[in-house]
Curated annotation (Swiss-Prot):
Annotated organism of origin: Bacillus subtilis (strain 168)
Membrane topology qualifier: Multi-pass membrane protein
Places the protein is found: Cell membrane
Lineage, opening ranks: Bacteria, Bacillati, Bacillota, Bacilli, Bacillales
Protein name (database record): Uncharacterized protein YnfC
GO terms for cellular component: plasma membrane
Keywords: Cell membrane, Membrane, Transmembrane, Transmembrane helix
Transmembrane parts of this sequence: 25-47, 78-97
Length: 136
């Protein structure tokens, strides 16, 4: 996986400052590690299969073992698929919640900028509100 592309994608996100970008990258990295670890746990391990083939001498026992192993693999794949679906749902919720909060803060910033612009354009600065008296 090319981290340069991922960092470039996250650096193009508008809004917030550097802190928001760092938090987003951190959340995405944690989510990626969680998905990778669950995927690793759902893969059947090949080295166990070879050991069992050597240990079983009878053809019937080998067939039963394969059937049991296939059932275990199927359970693992179903569990892995469910976990992966749950993780993707969490990722979507995380990103939508973050974009909503970013939109809210952006709206607040625009409102604040508008009020300051109106204040600076008003006649407030045209008048002298503070009388300076020289100290004697």
């Amino acid at each position: 996986m090319d981290w340069g592309i991922i960092i470039k994608i996250f650096s193009n996100i508008k809004g917030g400052g550097d802190h928001l970008k760092k938090v987003t990258i951190l959340k995405a990295s944690i989510l990626f590690l969680a998905i990778a670890s669950f995927h690793l746990f759902s893969i059947p391990h090949a080295f166990d299969i070879g050991h069992h083939y050597k240990a079983v001498a009878d053809q019937q026992e080998m067939h039963e073992m394969k059937a049991g192993q296939n059932a275990d693999d199927e359970k693992k794949s179903i569990t892995g698929a469910f976990t992966l679906t749950a993780l993707w749902a969490m990722a979507v919720l995380l990103l939508t919640a973050e974009s909503k909060s970013t939109g809210y803060s952006r709206r607040r910033q625009r409102k604040k900028s508008f009020i300051l612009a109106k204040f600076y354009q008003s006649s407030y600065f045209g008048k002298l509100h503070v009388q300076h008296h020289p100290i004697m």
